[in-house]
Swiss-Prot record:
Transmembrane segments: none annotated. Binds 1 Mg(2+) ion per subunit. The gene is aroK. Catalyzes the specific phosphorylation of the 3-hydroxyl group of shikimic acid using ATP as a cosubstrate. The lineage of its organism: Bacteria, Pseudomonadati, Chlamydiota, Chlamydiia, Chlamydiales. It is found in: Cytoplasm. This is Shikimate kinase. GO terms for molecular function: ATP binding; magnesium ion binding; shikimate kinase activity. Its main location: cytoplasm. It comes from the Bacteria.
């Protein structure tokens, strides 16, 4: 039976609709660690306003500042943290993540076509709403995220509980495995 290192603060980044929040919640339960979502923390700071509303009100620069403040409000403890789609791309936020002891930044991935399909059924983030080509913009952003971390993990497009649990196990085996435990 493998054992997992639960002393890390795991930051999940990825494109919009990849499943950072959903997977992060399942992973936190799987590992019995607290879960934080910077989008939810940001909304809480603005009495429930959505990130889209906050972006419209403050523009790109103001929104980035607020994303950074939401990130800095996350306690430095072993936990799972779902980052807003652009949070790690913002230099102060990226430096803040890397400056934390035992931080692990992991890029969650799904095929761009799957993400475009998901975004068609949801609200497209304000940063992407006026992009000439959603697919090209997502591809460029994915390249930028890939340049920030060599830790990438491909999720399954399937969202059943069983599939998510398999993803949690695979994730832990890949990034958090310590050694085999013997119960003899």
């Amino acid at each position: 039976m493998p054992t997992f290192d639960t002393t890390k603060q795991i930051f999940l980044c990825g494109l919009p609709s990849v499943g950072k929040t959903s997977f992060g919640q399942h992973l936190s339960q799987f590992l019995s660690l607290p879960f934080f979502d910077t989008d939810h923390l940001l909304s809480d700071r603005f009495h429930g306003d959505s990130p889209k509303t906050i972006y419209q009100r403050y523009g790109e620069e103001g929104f980035c500042r607020e994303e950074f403040l939401a990130l800095t409000s996350v306690p430095v403890i072993p936990s799972i943290v779902a980052l807003g789609g652009c949070t790690p791309i913002i230099e102060p936020s990226y430096a803040h993540i890397l400056g934390r002891n035992s931080a692990l930044l992991v890029l969650l991935e799904l095929p761009i076509a799957t993400l475009c399909q998901r975004l068609q059924h949801r609200s497209i983030p304000e940063r992407l709403a006026h992009a000439p080509s959603l697919e090209d913009t997502l591809s460029q952003r994915l390249d930028k995220l890939r340049s920030l971390t060599s830790n990438a993990f491909s999720l399954r497009a399937e969202t059943s509980s069983e599939a998510v649990m398999r993803d949690c196990q695979s994730f832990c085996l890949r990034f958090l495995s310590t050694k085999e435990s013997s119960y003899a």
